[in-house]
């Protein structure tokens, strides 16, 4: 039997994934042989990048400059070196549910849109999603997070985590596991409604003591701490100060969302090595709608003693200060 591949795989060293060697070994194990076609090749990725409307003109220009000025092997080497990192992720685990619906129309008795549910998808989001993403290129990842008192969805969360993630959970008294359910039109994929199951009051003293004991034990065992503070009652001001005083590289993301806007702030933290927020969150933090972003970044880094601040700006990219 013959296993065919395109000519771009003829030189195995050009395959950055290294999977072509595994494929050849599998073919030979069943007495097959691998052959390569000879023809003009068209890379689907290249065609999409050239002719697809994924990026605007300024983004295309930036990508082209990056391609011309950066060495891919050097970037890949930097990413590969992350394999040696031991990373601790701290933050709320959020169960993201998406109910895909068909719109039936207006109710006959009330001015209400009526939907018929078709199917539901469920994901382990929040800090669990961050940990799962990191596990792809970091060898050891620990997740310190919060679930509800009755441990709802715990099995689902654990099953969704790769083998190189070690989870540690605080079970918040008198609270459910945070669940955010969105109703989505199955054709347009636009969201019609969101329903949150959440108790976002601060954890009681016993729960906080458990969290601080975990932090004191786990932080010295890691090279990096990533804090994802969703403002749902897991990380109090005292906890933020506890994390800030640790002598370890600490990265912070403190998000604004529908449940915490007006009450959530980054200023509980101090001496952060790297903070990542979007422009709206930066302006919200400083109560400033109009000033230049660069000036606001300078003000925030000075007031919170942030060494590196990244502000994302949607299709305008990101700024590092």
Where are these regions (language model features)?
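Short glycine-rich anion-binding loops that position phosphate/pyrophosphate groups of nucleotides
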Residues: 8-11, 93-94, 198, 230-233, ...
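Nucleotidyltransferase catalytic core that binds NTPs
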Residues: 1-68
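Hydrophobic anchor at the start of a short beta-strand
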Residues: 87, 141, 167-168, 250, ...
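Conserved N-terminal subdomain of the carbohydrate kinase-like
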Residues: 95-226, 246
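Conserved phosphate/ATP/ADP-binding segment of small-molecule kinases
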Residues: 76, 237-321
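Structural motif
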Residues: 88-90, 194-196, 223-226, 251, ...
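Positively charged, low-complexity intrinsically disordered leader regions
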Residues: 66-104
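Glycine/threonine-rich flexible loop motifs
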Residues: 9-21, 101, 232-238, 285-287
